[in-house]
Amino acid sequence: MAKKVSKFFRIGVEGDTCDGRVISAQDIQEMAETFDPRVYGCRINLEHLRGILPDGIFKRYGDVAELKAEKIDDDSALKGKWALFAKITPTDDLIAMNKAAQKVYTSMEIQPNFANTGKCYLVGLAVTDDPASLGTEYLEFCRTAKHNPLNRFKLSPENLISVATPVELEFEDLPETVFTALTEKVKSIFGRKQASDDARLNDVHEAVTAVAEHVQEKLSATEQRLAEMETAFSALKQEVTDRADETSQAFTRLKNSLDHTESLTQQRRSKATGGGGDALMTNC
């Protein structure tokens, strides 16, 4: 099954957080500028809860792939505010929840001084069902509470958690590569439940055969493409050579023609001054 990637959707807007602090337009822009999954990957969790079991309800539900910052330009009350937009690569469970109209809001976890850079970074993205749990009513409680109840959900106490934002997720297939296609094929083979060692050995043999056939198929296709490129290059080389010869011959003909053509700017010899010039003398 091909992996999915979402289109860009809004995950947060400048404004209040759940502890009374404010996310500024600069914070939004910094998160878009600094985000790099190779430096720190931002994973998607449920209700800002990070479970440790891969099969538990609070497992991870995908990753943030890209971020961008844009000003909102619509007829809503948010017009003119800076917003953060994300592309995500979801798990099948998140896609299923979204199709069932569950967990349709997002809430950001922001680290203000990420890695001592002095800039904000998106370190977590939660999906939630009820905006009130991270919205106005909950916001007021967190402002006045002696101990912020959200602190236990944060990676660091100084991190900010944004008010939840409703989202509409649209997914598209990621292009399938040779590696992903082969991986899925082998995984499907080893995913079968077998009772005996002979059956497992057969699975290993089938997997090795599948790998060999897949590699051979891709090598043959690559060789064919290389042969086509070589043929095209040879034809192009011959065409360039022919044109160069034609140009050289044309230049030689032009040079020879010019060498045998009298120059109109060349100085002429003056007429002879002896005798009477053009007069004819008669001896009488």
From Swiss-Prot:
Question: What are the recorded GO MF terms, alphabetically?
Answer: serine-type peptidase activity
Q: Which domain of life is it from?
A: Viruses
Documented EC number(s): 3.4.21.-
Name of one Pfam family that matches: Phage_GPO
A Gene Ontology biological process noted in the UniProt record is: viral procapsid maturation
Q: Which residues form the active site?
A: D19, H48, S107
The protein, known as: Capsid assembly scaffolding protein
